[in-house]
Amino acid sequence: MPFKITITEDADRQLRFLPAREQRILEAAVQARLEHQPTTPTRAIKRLRPNPLAHYELRAGGLRALYNVEGDEVVIVIVGRKVGNKLVVEGEEFHGHQDDSVEPPGKRAREDAE
């Protein structure tokens, strides 16, 4: 039975931040690799060190999708581009392992503006 793929509102916005070509590459990788065995480690799927946002990473060239598996559903929570050893999300460096109060880039700025 295939897993249901969902994407959070923040991750969808992060995906739309990427150029159209990169969006298509990442969307194709998500469909090809996460529908049937999203937790099986491969060259493209990696289990992450413990952090509050995501348990797995999908790699598609220099693109990354961080996600969790909840029952029969794959929930994509972060989308970005790997630059060297950094993950860049919406043009900002993402720090996912610094503390337990980690939030995706852009979320703090939106909350401050409200």
Task: Give the role of each language-model region.
Residues M1-P2, P38:
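Short helix-capping/hinge SLiMs at alpha-helix to coil transitions
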Residues P2, E9, R24, A28, ...:
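Enriched for short, Lys/Arg-rich terminal
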Residues F3, Q14, R49-N51:
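Acidic/histidine-enriched, beta-strand-rich ligand/metal-binding domains
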